[in-house]
Swiss-Prot record:
SUPFAM superfamilies: Nucleic acid-binding proteins, Translation proteins SH3-like domain. Component of the mitochondrial large ribosomal subunit (mt-LSU). Mature mammalian 55S mitochondrial ribosomes consist of a small (28S) and a large (39S) subunit. The 28S small subunit contains a 12S ribosomal RNA (12S mt-rRNA) and 30 different proteins. The 39S large subunit contains a 16S rRNA (16S mt-rRNA), a copy of mitochondrial valine transfer RNA (mt-tRNA(Val)), which plays an integral structural role, and 52 different proteins. This is Large ribosomal subunit protein uL2m. Residues 264-283 are annotated as: Disordered. Keywords: Mitochondrion, Ribonucleoprotein, Ribosomal protein, Transit peptide. It is found in: Mitochondrion. One of its GO terms (cellular component) is nucleoplasm. GO terms for molecular function: RNA binding; structural constituent of ribosome. The keyword Ribosomal protein applies. SMART domains: Ribosomal_L2 (SM01383), Ribosomal_L2_C (SM01382).
């Protein structure tokens, strides 16, 4: 009897997909007032019920990303530790958990970011250089015009220094000075660089760890070839901006932890103490360097022919 009743109930269900109705009026009238009008009035889609459990639902079709609603601030922001787990609660990265409470400071990795009312190269003054718990390198608070921002500090950067941010490529190479940001095409060959962009205007993505630096090897046909700290070569456009010098906190790899508890303070959990078989990866091997990584869209051979 129960099986017959369940069969009749399943047959009575309407399995047709939900139909989309016309956009409903604004559900968030306050969204227009946020971020000086950056948020537009979202249009909601009403789904008509097709099952008894789906009575009414409203979905936002054009709701902007949360990053566009976040206003930049130099004030440290509170963080919630994930313990290496994703949104499902499963561990994705082992060895993470616990540790002292940390506050996140928003780092501006796009060095050439002029103010709205100005254009061209501009200077900034270093206010302070301090420790950042969220990264191995030190950070610097710089000010220029009517704003302040955090950037990655270089090796010899101190409070009171003046740094230059430029996007101009001249006929002659500039006199490279530590802490300044220039396009790769404006720097002389052999310059030590850090915080390199992979695409113009995207922000620094390479050589950001403490004590690291790359080398500008050569410039070919509007592109620049640099050597990463791993000895791998990378080809990018010469308009990509890089910072001159070496990243701060050079002695980071020479520190002595001293005890296991200090690693727990840093948020590192212990791994298993069991003996693990060495599967062939252990030991030194002679491996060839990986091929050069290129972010430049070169024309193919078929297109040239």
């Amino acid at each position: 009897m129960a099986l017959c009743a369940l069969t009749r109930a399943l047959r009575s269900l309407n399995l047709a997909p939900p139909t989309v109705a016309a956009p409903a009026p604004s559900l968030f009238p306050a969204a227009q007032m946020m971020n000086n009008g950056l948020l537009q009035q979202p249009s909601a889609l009403m789904l008509l019920p097709c099952r008894p459990v789906l009575t009414s639902v409203a979905l936002n079709a054009n709701f902007v990303s949360w990053k566009s609603r976040t206003k930049y601030t130099i004030t440290p922001v509170k963080m919630r530790k994930s313990g290496g787990r994703d949104h499902t609660g499963r561990i994705r990265v082992h060895g993470i958990g616990g540790g002292h409470k940390q506050r996140y400071r928003m780092i501006d990795f796009l060095r050439f970011r002029p103010e709205e009312t100005k254009s061209g190269p501009f200077e900034e003054k270093v206010i302070q250089v301090r420790y950042d718990p969220c990264r191995s390198a030190d950070i610097a608070l710089v000010a220029g015009g009517s704003r302040k921002r955090w950037i990655i500090a270089t090796e010899n950067m101190q409070a009171g220094d003046t740094i230059l941010n430029s996007n101009h490529i001249g006929r002659m190479a500039v006199a490279a000075r530590e802490g300044d940001a220039h396009p790769l095409g404006a720097l002389p060959v052999g310059t030590l660089i850090n915080n390199v962009e992979s695409e113009p205007g995207r922000g620094a993505q390479y050589i950001r760890a403490a004590g690291t630096c790359g080398v500008l090897l050569r410039k070919v046909n509007g592109t620049a070839i640099i050597q990463l700290p791993s000895k791998r070569q990378m080809q990018v456009l010469e308009t990509c901006v890089a910072t001159v010098g070496r990243v701060s906190n050079v002695d980071h790899n020479k520190r002595v932890i001293g005890k296991a508890g200090r690693n727990r303070w840093l948020g590192k959990r212990p791994n298993s103490g069991r003996w693990h078989r060495k599967g062939g990866w252990a030991g030194r091997k002679i491996r060839p360097l990986p091929p050069m990584k290129s972010y430049v869209k070169l024309p193919s051979a078929s297109a040239q022919s």
